[in-house]
Amino acid sequence: MTHASLPLALTQGDPAGIGPDIAINAWAKRRENGVPPFIFIGDPDVVASRAALIGVPVNIETCDPESAVSLFERAFPILPLPVGFDVQAGQPHVGAAHATIKAIEMAVSLTVEGRAAAVVTNPIAKSVLYEAGFGFPGHTEFLADLALRQTGKPVTPVMMIAGPKVRVVPVTIHIPIKDVPTALTEELIVTTCRIIDTDLREKFGIAAPRLAVAGLNPHAGEDGALGTEDRDVVHPATIRLRKDGIDAFGPLPADTMFHDAARKRYDVAVCMYHDQALIPAKALGFDDSVNVTLGLPFIRTSPDHGTAFGIAGQGIASETSLVAALKMAAEIYARSRVGA
């Protein structure tokens, strides 16, 4: 199979959520939105019932990745992964956890084996997976473990939200805010920023990335008056990064980093915790932002929203963020093939 013929490996996510809805909508609007070919890893019965529920005609064909690209124009290609029970839209069930996890594992395997171009994941419900014994805080950490299992090499995953107006990275991710000051170390900031710098160059074609580093505390700590972390941890990290030739500057007061003029000064905002990064990202591009995992030996993107159980099966879920995630994955893959 040539590189040009590789499909994207799209996971079902939680089958009771809007993953099936938005995948169906993305395929139905593939021509008008220029959606790159994907193979959907999930349950054909879920797709068929959800398509009927939301009133979108879809021609389903089960296939392997090698056939997906040629099928994509006329059919919704599925690599079958039965859930094992009758899924009801909007009603999450622990019985779906195994298939949800297995779909992610299959997508990673296909991509590492060179049978798919990239992994694109639909939203999962962490609480449902935890009930089934899932031992990871979220997608990002699970993907890092899969990368280790597939390649034998440990990785440090970095979550970046990329939208049309801003890119953001939280240095700490899925931990309680009370634990952030302890988890936030100079070494973690330096490692995260090195990965950002490398991947913005290699995956996004930015020749000289500019990294704006936010402070942890209000006003970036006011030189220790409002907390010592920015003075003692964040600032030394930026000094080390600049010595390494990485254009990282800060710590900056986070409340002045996201207005129009400020965003022109950097390529990515490096934030200290989850909500410091994701609130501005979603405020500036809720429908068309993409979650990209940097630092992995394969490409992974996902829509920047959750399972939205409350609207699953109602025909009102927007596929915009998923389409953006599919397009970004395809663009990164195409860029990676230049000169390969």
UniProtKB/Swiss-Prot annotation:
Domain of life: Bacteria
EC number: 1.1.1.262
List of residues binding substrate: H139, T140, K282, N291, R300
Any one GO CC term of the record: cytoplasm
Listed pathway(s): Cofactor biosynthesis; pyridoxine 5'-phosphate biosynthesis; pyridoxine 5'-phosphate from D-erythrose 4-phosphate: step 4/5
Gene Ontology molecular function: 4-hydroxythreonine-4-phosphate dehydrogenase activity; cobalt ion binding; magnesium ion binding; NAD binding; zinc ion binding
GN (gene name): pdxA
Note accompanying the cofactor annotation: Binds 1 divalent metal cation per subunit. Can use ions such as Zn(2+), Mg(2+) or Co(2+).
Leftover remarks: The active site is located at the dimer interface.
Functional description taken from the UniProt entry: Catalyzes the NAD(P)-dependent oxidation of 4-(phosphooxy)-L-threonine (HTP) into 2-amino-3-oxo-4-(phosphooxy)butyric acid which spontaneously decarboxylates to form 3-amino-2-oxopropyl phosphate (AHAP).
Cofactor names: Zn(2+); Mg(2+); Co(2+)
Binding-site residues for a divalent metal cation, renumbered to this chain: H174, H219, H274
Keyword annotations from UniProtKB, A to Z: Cobalt, Cytoplasm, Magnesium, Metal-binding, NAD, NADP, Oxidoreductase, Pyridoxine biosynthesis, Zinc
Name of the protein in its database record: 4-hydroxythreonine-4-phosphate dehydrogenase
Gene Ontology BP term (one): pyridoxine biosynthetic process
Family to which this protein belongs: Belongs to the PdxA family.
Record note on quaternary structure: Homodimer.
Matching Pfam families: PdxA
NCBIfam families: pdxA, PRK05312.1
Primary location recorded for the protein, binned into one broad class: cytoplasm
Reactions catalysed according to its record: 4-(phosphooxy)-L-threonine + NAD(+) = 3-amino-2-oxopropyl phosphate + CO2 + NADH
Compartments where found: Cytoplasm
SUPFAM superfamilies: Isocitrate/Isopropylmalate dehydrogenase-like
InterPro entries noted in UniProt: PdxA, PdxA_fam
Organism of origin: Agrobacterium fabrum (strain C58 / ATCC 33970)
